[in-house]
């Protein structure tokens, strides 16, 4: 996770944003989320909708390792901006 933070975002906001991204990626890779994880996504629906548009577009049958690497690259690009 990003320890450097982003200008204008609190550590809690960064945590929520990153957790939403991770949960969405897990769901996209076919993982079953727990009830508490699904509730977290419902609670932060606004963050979910903004993150969905930023997720890398990959086919569902793509290997999990490739999806994680794409996610890592997008995280690195986000930090550079």
UniProtKB/Swiss-Prot annotation:
Taken from the UniProt record, the cysteine pairs bridged by disulfide bonds within this chain are none
First-listed, main subcellular location of the protein, grouped into a coarse class: cytoplasm
Q: Which UniProt keywords apply?
A: Cytoplasm, Nucleus, Phosphoprotein, Wnt signaling pathway
Q: What is a single cellular component term in the Gene Ontology annotation?
A: beta-catenin-ICAT complex
Q: Which GO terms describe its molecular function?
A: armadillo repeat domain binding; beta-catenin binding; transcription coactivator binding; transcription regulator inhibitor activity
Q: In which tissues is it expressed?
A: Highly expressed in heart, brain, liver and skeletal muscle. Detected at low levels in kidney, testis and lung.
Its subcellular locations are: Cytoplasm; Nucleus
Annotated GO biological process: anterior/posterior pattern specification; branching involved in ureteric bud morphogenesis; negative regulation of canonical Wnt signaling pathway; negative regulation of mesenchymal cell proliferation; negative regulation of protein-containing complex assembly; negative regulation of smooth muscle cell proliferation; negative regulation of transcription by RNA polymerase II; negative regulation of transcription initiation by RNA polymerase II
Please tell me whether the keyword Electron transport is annotated for this protein: no
Query: Which branch of life, at top level?
Result: Eukaryota
Instruction: Indicate yes or no for the key word Phosphoprotein.
Output: yes
Q: List the Gene3D superfamilies hit by this protein, alphabetically.
A: Beta-catenin-interacting ICAT
Instruction: List every position bearing Phosphoserine.
Output: 59
Q: Which InterPro entries match?
A: ICAT_dom, ICAT_sf
**PANTHER family from the UniProt entry:** BETA-CATENIN-INTERACTING PROTEIN 1
* Assembly and oligomerization: Binds CTNNB1.
Family, as annotated: Belongs to the CTNNBIP1 family.
Q: What does this protein do?
A: Prevents the interaction between CTNNB1 and TCF family members, and acts as a negative regulator of the Wnt signaling pathway.
Specify the protein name.
Answer: Beta-catenin-interacting protein 1
Species this protein is from: Mus musculus (Mouse)
Print the organism lineage.
Eukaryota, Metazoa, Chordata, Craniata, Vertebrata
Which gene codes for it? Ctnnbip1
